[in-house]
């Protein structure tokens, strides 16, 4: 049975973790989000988020989007390649409803599924 947890080691926490992904990322984008990915040396995928106040003004909206991203990653982590991911939110994301955000994330994750 697959464990669907989201522990601390599944997150990018330090600036050098983010810098590693920014050096040579594989880029997938839609209008409201961008996912940068880079193969890591670990045995599990990790995710980091950049949700700028410039694009999403209200804190509760930023937190809501982070929760949706974490939940989507948690449910798809066993299907993903062993990579570090950074999700960057763009303007217009708050105008989307939950279903559309989750559907967009599924579409983005699908590009990084294991074969």
From Swiss-Prot:
Belongs to the RnpA family. Consists of a catalytic RNA component (M1 or rnpB) and a protein subunit. Pfam families: Ribonuclease_P. RNaseP catalyzes the removal of the 5'-leader sequence from pre-tRNA to produce the mature 5'-terminus. It can also cleave other RNA substrates such as 4.5S RNA. The protein component plays an auxiliary but essential role in vivo by binding to the 5'-leader sequence and broadening the substrate specificity of the ribozyme. Its EC number is 3.1.26.5. It catalyses: Endonucleolytic cleavage of RNA, removing 5'-extranucleotides from tRNA precursor. GO terms for biological process: tRNA 5'-leader removal. This is Ribonuclease P protein component. It comes from Baumannia cicadellinicola subsp. Homalodisca coagulata. InterPro entries: Ribosomal_Su5_D2-typ_SF, Ribsml_uS5_D2-typ_fold_subgr, RNase_P. Keywords: Endonuclease, Hydrolase, Nuclease, RNA-binding, tRNA processing. Gene3D superfamilies: 3.30.230.10. It comes from the Bacteria. One of its GO terms (cellular component) is ribonuclease P complex. GO terms for molecular function: 3'-tRNA processing endoribonuclease activity; ribonuclease P activity; tRNA binding.
